[in-house]
Amino acid sequence: MPLRSVILGCGAYLPARVLTNEDLTRIVETSDEWIVERTGIKSRHIAADGENTSDLAEAAARAALAHAGVAAEEVDLIVLATATPDQTFPATATKVQARLGITRGAAFDVQAVCSGFVYALAIADNFIKAGQARTALVIGAETFSRILDWTDRTTCVLFGDGAGAVVLRAEEGEGTADRGILSTHLHSDGRHHDLLYVDGGPSTTQTVGHLRMKGQEVFKHAVVNLAHVVEEALAANGLSPADISWLVPHQANRRIIESTARKLKLDGSRVVLTVDHHGNTSAASIPLALCEAVHDGRVQRGDIVLLEAMGGGFTWGAALVRW
């Protein structure tokens, strides 16, 4: 029987500091009503001074390992999705690897912005299916507060910091009845790179830069691309929207999430929504939302869980999981 990646456990970490919409009114010209109406966001977490992406990632990884009942020394692959690494190099994943006391296997970063966790999950899944890894840590971690222009009210109100992680283990399985990742689907279209980007980098400006976004254009592409990749994932497994137990989308904007759910004819009660208290945490948003739904008892053994995201590039993707 072929190998399949089973999610054994998940973990999350959110910085202690909470920044509310009311707090933001003292930084930029905005209001709670303006932000909630357009995004659904009420608050977000912000990393403390000296608290880096690797710190968030490590905390989420430790929580995931504990939840899975897996010892760190069993891990032979770490794939960390982030657009806000500690340094240009080495990979933030290698820092996490060292802090966990892991000295074997591979550890590397993946950069697909808000789609990063789905990309990282797909990569780890394929390592496992190929027999090149047995136990993988997949992490999404971001400190987007460090790349925001805090004078731009159209972007600084959207993002937050955090990290989420899952532990994958190779197990035998096939078909849609067995537990594990059923399929992953990745896409990108670089023609639209200038609609969502950071205006800095080591080879261009030698600076970190700030996030820039043409929000309305991103929204239009997101609604279409996410609907298509979700349909692709369902068709690949001979399933219909009615078979989905839970939709765990990238938490970018409540309007995008609700639009995707409507296209799938999914009742809102089956959509995991955390954007109101997390904001957009980029690659961390899906594992943070998934972990919340697992730990509060919504996601149960045997459920079909659909993950989907779109990010800068554009990149987008979906993963279908039998929990």
From Swiss-Prot:
InterPro entries per the UniProt record, alphabetical: ACP_syn_III_C, ACP_syn_III_N, FabH, Thiolase-like
Pathway(s) this gene product operates in, as recorded in its UniProt entry: Lipid metabolism; fatty acid biosynthesis
Short name of any one Pfam family annotated for the protein: ACP_syn_III
Record-level Gene Ontology MF annotations: 3-oxoacyl-[acyl-carrier-protein] synthase activity; beta-ketoacyl-acyl-carrier-protein synthase III activity
Region (ACP-binding): 251-255
Keywords: Acyltransferase, Cytoplasm, Fatty acid biosynthesis, Fatty acid metabolism, Lipid biosynthesis, Lipid metabolism, Multifunctional enzyme, Transferase
EC number(s) stated in the UniProt entry for this protein: 2.3.1.180
Domain of life according to the entry: Bacteria
GO cellular component, one term: cytoplasm
Active site, renumbered: C114, H250, N280
Transmembrane stretches, start-end: none
GO BP, sorted A to Z: fatty acid biosynthetic process
Localization, UniProt: Cytoplasm
Enzyme class: transferase
Record field: catalytic activity: malonyl-[ACP] + acetyl-CoA + H(+) = 3-oxobutanoyl-[ACP] + CO2 + CoA
Domain comment in the entry: The last Arg residue of the ACP-binding site is essential for the weak association between ACP/AcpP and FabH.
Subunit structure, as described in the record: Homodimer.
Family, as annotated: Belongs to the thiolase-like superfamily. FabH family.
Described function: Catalyzes the condensation reaction of fatty acid synthesis by the addition to an acyl acceptor of two carbons from malonyl-ACP. Catalyzes the first condensation reaction which initiates fatty acid synthesis and may therefore play a role in governing the total rate of fatty acid production. Possesses both acetoacetyl-ACP synthase and acetyl transacylase activities. Its substrate specificity determines the biosynthesis of branched-chain and/or straight-chain of fatty acids.
UniProt-recorded name of the protein: Beta-ketoacyl-[acyl-carrier-protein] synthase III
UniProt lineage: Bacteria, Pseudomonadati, Pseudomonadota, Alphaproteobacteria, Rhodospirillales
